[in-house]
Every structure is written in C-alpha cells, then in structure tokens.
Amino acid sequence: RLYSTIGYSLAGGGKRLRPMLLMLAHGIFTDRFQAALPAAAAVEVFHNFTLLHDDIMDNAAVRRGKPSVYAKWGPSVAILSGDAMMICAYRLLSEVPAELLPRILGTFNTMALEVCEGQQYDMDFESKRKVSVVEYMHMIELKTSVLLAGSVTIGAMLGGASEEDCRKLRRFAIELGLAFQLQDDLLDSYGDDRLGKAIGGDILEGKQTYLMITAMSRADEATREALRTTRLDARLSDAEKIAAVKSIYDRLDVPRLTEQQISLRFERALSILDTLSADKARTQRIREYAESLIGRKN
C-alpha cells in the first residue's frame, strides 16, 4: 500500500512546473539534459510530499479533483507516504555528480526548511486577525517561491552555471513565484469556472489572500466587518457570499491592484533573465514558459 499511495499521489497531475523550471534552467547552460533528470524528479517528489502533509493539516478531502490520500486512506497512511516520498526525493538527489552533491544538497536542504517555515506562517495566519501585505508576501516567498528558486538553482548548478548566474536565476524564480501565487489568489475569485476550477473557495474558507489583505487595508471598519462575517452568514448561499465579497473587492479596486503587483513581479523576473551571461537565445525557452504560467486562466 505504501508505494501504491505514492503512485496515486504522483499520478494526480499538476503543472510539473518545478521540474520544468529545473530542466529549463539547466538547458540555458548545456544540452546534456540527462544529467538533470534525477534532480528534476527529486523536486517534483518533494513537492508532492508537501502536498500530502498539507492536506492533513488543512483537512482537505480533494486534491487535483480526486480524493486526497488523506481522505482516501486516512492521516496515518498520508503521513507515512509523505515521509517515504521525502526519502525518495533524497535518494533521487544522490544520483547527481559526486562533485556537485554537497552544493546541491545544501541548496535543497535550505529550500526544504524554508518551505516548512512558510507553511508554519500560513497556519499562524489562520488565527491572526490582521495580516499585513509585507507579512503575506514573505509567507508566499517561503511557501511557494523558494521551491521554484531551489529548482532553477539546482538545474543551473548541474548545467555548469557560474555562482553569479545561479544567484540571478534564484532571484528570477523568487519574483516569478510571487507573481504565480498572486495570480493564483486572483484566479480563485476571478477565474473562469468553465475551465473546471471552482471559484471563490478562498472566500468561503476565510483564507488570508493578497486580495483579502489588500481589501482589509483599504476598507473602513464597517466594510472590514463585512469581509470578516459575510462567509459565516447562514442566510446566504455560497454563491451570494462570494458575490458579496467580490463586490467589495471591486469597489476597493482590489483586482486592479493585484494585477498591478503581478505585472510588477513578473517584469522584474524577466528583466533578471536579460542579465545572465548566457546568450539570450538560450534563455528564450524559460522566458516563454514563464510567460505561459502568468498568462494562464486557471
């Protein structure tokens, strides 16, 4: 059962953006892509490990449109499967060239610990009445961006990049990750439900998102109280709750401000690519992939 649950988790789909970014960063500096495959698999297995444990902490019954491992087999199996996936990630990582292993392990370990720090911040925010934009951006940098940053850094290291180029790619991925998460926040409330993703889940769960935090910072006290309590109003349907909160967002110009921040972070990311020592033609694929992520509709 242990390996069948791991297989179930890995077969669940997803964007595979972390291994893609690792391979694309690697490809900026070399065409010998086979050397990066074990590390690419490692970051994807690690990411899925975090999702297994996230679902336990969030009491989440669904993951990628299917019952979560936690819901299907229970918390004990989900914990054990996640632990095994973490070990599998390290085993895959051990296949990188021996001379690079200490640097890559150091990068991976720092990344993994920062992801845990980000998850703790996210849980702390659930019981915190007021969260600032600065605090939120720091949390999503740890929870989302650093895994992208670790992935591109490891890929670049394996490709023979200089330390300076590795640092630049890390910063590129931090900015891209921030743009990606802010867009996730925006799409949860303003995405197209015809594309198969439910709209308004963050509002109904009372999650601290960039939209909610920005609205709270711009609202008067009566409006802040409405933002806090609308989702709890038993007289309203879920659709009415979502519509009521979105009307406040619209009145406070929150969607435009969020889009502005997404564009700012994304443009910063692309500008960093232009400073790499590699020929611009070799950065084209990672640039196009980044553009596809920020241009998505769900």
Summary of predicted features, one role per range:
Residues R1-N298:
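All-alpha prenyltransferase/terpene-synthase fold signal
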